């Protein structure tokens, strides 16, 4: 059952040595970073239940093999003042244009202000699930599956690289490289941990890059990016590696911390086009984002 557009999280209670007396004690230790007062409020508000829907309280005993469900406490979130747009829907698919600054799925400090929660609220469908990733800072096309039965088929398209993806990005114009070109790099986790870096060894990422347009003053270019792999931050790292970091990138070449309500400088990266053969109907599908990147906004 959904609550304000969010589905409950599930937690299995394992058999452990020196098990706590209560479920409350266990979750407080397991999720110590959350805070005892937060869990106390969840129990007091009736947000923690067993799989049969029975409400658990602070004194409910710990029983290994049991599965509990709980809703994250919805704190006051910074409202993302940009709207998504549904551009296609059928019995199994929902294709959406995601604005900049909006996370796809709940994580960290974001629950309500995510695309998935918004869609669950407006459609009433608790089975919606993203078929792939898209950074919070990136705008453009997102595919969601509408049924549990279809989820694996569409996620496999991305995992098996059966999707044609085209991105647009605005970055400095350069004479140091001749376009079109290919970038093949080995990417690894960077420092801080939420960034990526160029490592050693065989390349595990591949992007074809070309120039679509140049600004009137010749300082900026709009690049067309065609990744054949889908590593985290791949396009951002590839352009930064070429010495042309994407405009308004707060991670590359260096991390810049911005306030959560700072919406002035969106990352100039857009998931513009997706095409594939539908695994259910075997029909060719192609979608284009209605958003555009504009030199005047940089």
Regions inferred by a protein language model and the residue ranges of each:
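RNA pseudouridine synthases
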Residues: 1-298
């Amino acid at each position: 059952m959904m609550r304000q557009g969010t589905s409950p999280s599930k937690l299995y209670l394992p058999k452990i040595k020196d098990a706590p007396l209560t479920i409350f004690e266990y979750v407080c230790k397991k999720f110590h970073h959350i805070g005892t007062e937060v869990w106390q409020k969840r129990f007091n508000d009736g947000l923690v239940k067993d799989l049969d829907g029975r409400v658990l309280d602070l004194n409910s005993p710990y029983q290994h093999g049991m599965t509990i469900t709980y809703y994250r406490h919805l704190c006051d979130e910074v409202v993302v003042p940009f709207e998504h747009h549904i551009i296609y829907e059928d019995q199994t698919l929902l294709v959406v244009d995601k604005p900049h600054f909006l996370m796809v799925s709940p994580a960290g400090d974001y629950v309500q202000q995510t695309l998935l929660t918004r869609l669950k609220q407006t459609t009433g469908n608790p089975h919606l699930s993203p078929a792939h990733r898209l950074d919070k800072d990136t705008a453009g096309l997102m595919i969601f599956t509408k049924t549990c039965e279809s989820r694996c088929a569409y996620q496999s398209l991305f995992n098996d690289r059966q999707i044609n993806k085209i991105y647009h990005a605005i970055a400095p114009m350069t004479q140091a490289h001749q376009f079109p070109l290919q970038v093949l790099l080995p990417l690894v986790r960077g420092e801080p941990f939420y960034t990526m870096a160029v490592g050693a060894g065989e390349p595990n990422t591949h992007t074809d890059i070309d120039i679509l347009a140049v600004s009137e003053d010749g300082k900026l270019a709009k690049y067309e990016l065609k990744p054949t792999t889908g590593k985290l931050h791949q396009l951002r790292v590839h352009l930064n590696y070429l010495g042309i970091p994407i405009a308004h990138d707060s991670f590359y070449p260096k991390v810049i911390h911005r306030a959560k309500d700072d919406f002035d400088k969106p990352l100039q990266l857009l998931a513009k086009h997706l095409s594939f053969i539908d695994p259910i109907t075997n029909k060719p599908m192609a979608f284009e984002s209605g958003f555009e990147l504009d030199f005047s906004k940089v």
